[in-house]
């Protein structure tokens, strides 16, 4: 017997996490999307589409489908069967939250199939616990800029509207860097000085973003917790962190675990000089890739039902 539920689409954005000192706690939403088209039917069917997903499973072991079952598990229900078509614009293993977009889209889709038994805060908690940190899933779910923590008591967050005129320029190199490899190079312990530096700059960055103090971004985005250790894995990163402001960037950071690098820019001005500089850095380091400008996505994950 077929399900009476209507088909629907879930669209979850990419994200850029850390933004320098906000390690595992601060991120923003980028308008590149993972899209699921879900059609309730008598049996489960998973259909990855496009070249980015050519190597992903076309069955219930697919990460998106497994994410859908997480919603059912949290709700104490069985996931209704459906055909799930998956497409993504988010480059994989580049530090733009491809796994978080897939996870959030899947949990939201599973929740939708079940009739929305989970509220947004529970969806956030499910996804943050699955990822192990909330800095990508929170902006993917809510859009904008999000400060979030994950602990035994739950997942807590504050969403910030993007400051007026703040845009992002991303350099996406044509090589992959796994999060596990990027985490493996980090030290097990940090000095008191580096800890204080991280705390103070993360707090300043959150406050600057909340109040639209674009003039403080370059200083607030300084970081000694992860970028200095990951720089050898991303040719040209140190150059960009030190010099991007000379070419119009308001601040620069490794995006998530990399290798993508994010620069903030003022949308009222031209980014041509910054683009030229970033392409020069890639050329100097024997890399190829793309440089793109984006606004910060404000909507987060969106569900649309067929009419």
UniProtKB/Swiss-Prot annotation:
Reactions that this protein is recorded to catalyse: L-homoserine + ATP = O-phospho-L-homoserine + ADP + H(+)
Single Gene Ontology MF annotation: ATP binding
Primary location group: cytoplasm
SUPFAM superfamilies cross-referenced by the UniProt entry: GHMP Kinase, C-terminal domain, Ribosomal protein S5 domain 2-like
Enzyme class, UniProt record, top EC level: transferase
Annotated EC: 2.7.1.39
Keyword Chloroplast found: no
Any one GO biological process: threonine biosynthetic process
Binding site for ATP: 91-101
Any one Gene Ontology cellular component term annotated for this protein: cytoplasm
Keywords: Amino-acid biosynthesis, ATP-binding, Cytoplasm, Kinase, Nucleotide-binding, Threonine biosynthesis, Transferase
Intracellular or extracellular location(s): Cytoplasm
Pathways involved: Amino-acid biosynthesis; L-threonine biosynthesis; L-threonine from L-aspartate: step 4/5
Protein's job: Catalyzes the ATP-dependent phosphorylation of L-homoserine to L-homoserine phosphate.
Family: Belongs to the GHMP kinase family. Homoserine kinase subfamily.
Protein name per UniProt: Homoserine kinase
Gene source species: Deinococcus radiodurans (strain ATCC 13939 / DSM 20539 / JCM 16871 / CCUG 27074 / LMG 4051 / NBRC 15346 / NCIMB 9279 / VKM B-1422 / R1)
């Amino acid at each position: 017997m077929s399900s009476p539920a209507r088909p629907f689409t879930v669209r979850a954005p990419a994200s850029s996490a850390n933004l320098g000192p906000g390690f595992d706690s601060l991120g923003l939403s980028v308008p590149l999307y993972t899209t699921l088209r879900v059609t309730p039917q008598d049996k489960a069917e998973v259909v990855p589409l496009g070249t980015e997903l050519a190597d992903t499973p076309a069955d219930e072991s697919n990460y998106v489908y497994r994410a859908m079952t997480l919603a059912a598990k949290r709700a104490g229900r069985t996931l209704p069967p459906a055909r799930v078509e998956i497409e993504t614009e988010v480059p994989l293993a580049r530090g733009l939250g491809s796994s978080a977009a897939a996870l959030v889209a899947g949990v939201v889709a599973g929740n939708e199939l079940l009739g929305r038994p989970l509220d947004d805060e529970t969806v956030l908690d499910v996804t943050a616990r699955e990822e192990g940190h909330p800095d990508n899933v929170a902006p993917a779910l809510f859009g904008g800029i999000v400060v979030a923590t994950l602990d035994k008591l739950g997942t807590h967050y504050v969403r910030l509207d993007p400051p007026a005129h703040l845009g992002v320029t991303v350099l996406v190199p044509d090589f992959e860097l796994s999060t596990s490899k990027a985490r493996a190079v980090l030290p097990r312990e940090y000095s008191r000085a580096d800890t204080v530096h991280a705390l103070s700059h993360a707090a300043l960055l959150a406050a600057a973003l909340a109040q639209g103090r674009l003039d403080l971004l370059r200083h607030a985005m300084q970081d000694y917790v992860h970028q200095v250790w990951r720089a050898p894995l991303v040719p040209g990163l140190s150059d960009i962190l030190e010099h991007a402001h000379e070419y119009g960037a308001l601040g620069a950071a490794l995006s998530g675990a990399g290798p993508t690098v994010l620069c903030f820019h003022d949308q009222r001005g031209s980014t041509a000089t910054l683009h030229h500089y970033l392409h020069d850095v890639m050329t100097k380091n024997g890399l190829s890739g793309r440089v793109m400008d984006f606004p910060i996505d404000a909507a987060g994950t969106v569900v649309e039902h067929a009419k």
